[in-house]
């Protein structure tokens, strides 16, 4: 894959998106990026990794046998030495997630590896790892993942990943 586009117009393509996001986050847990960038105006503690059948227990024995939520994925990532940079709007909707993540990171001694920025006019959406860039219209919310029709692009071109990383660092 260099570039893959997903339009979530129906249940099948929404599952394709869920599978792609799950794969990206599993990959991150195995080999964390420095940092993982999550740019989304709206963010919620959505279900990201489906471990209800225990299929990831061999890789992650600490995973409970249920859906693993975004907040937990970030904590698992920090426990593995990764870092996370989140940009979102300063909305009340996002506040609980931001505050909870920053508090938990501080309590566990990971505060230097979590950065949360807010911008009132933020509209861009993207997830950037060291290997893939996901962009499009989707917020990291239940509606963005499971309800609304979204257009998403996954790109693992090293040139694209490097360019986006430079842009995000600025």
Predicted regions and their residues:
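PLD/PLD-like phosphodiesterase catalytic module centered on the HKD motif
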Residues: 1-170
């Amino acid at each position: 894959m260099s570039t893959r586009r997903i339009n979530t117009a129906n249940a099948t393509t929404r599952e394709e998106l869920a599978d792609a996001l799950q794969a990206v986050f599993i990959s991150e847990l195995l080999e964390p990026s420095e940092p993982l960038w999550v740019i989304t105006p709206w963010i919620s503690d959505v279900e990201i990794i489906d471990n209800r059948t225990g299929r990831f227990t061999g890789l992650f024995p600490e995973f409970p046998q249920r859906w693993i939520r975004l907040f937990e994925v970030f904590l698992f990532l920090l426990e593995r030495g990764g870092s996370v940079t989140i940009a979102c709007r300063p909305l009340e909707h996002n506040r609980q997630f931001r505050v909870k993540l920053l508090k938990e990171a501080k309590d566990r001694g990971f505060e230097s590896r979590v950065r949360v920025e807010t911008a009132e006019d933020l509209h861009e959406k993207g997830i950037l790892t060291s290997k893939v860039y996901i962009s499009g219209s989707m917020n990291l919310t239940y509606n963005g993942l499971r309800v609304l029709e979204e257009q998403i692009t996954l790109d693992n071109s090293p040139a694209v990943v490097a360019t986006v990383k430079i842009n995000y660092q600025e």
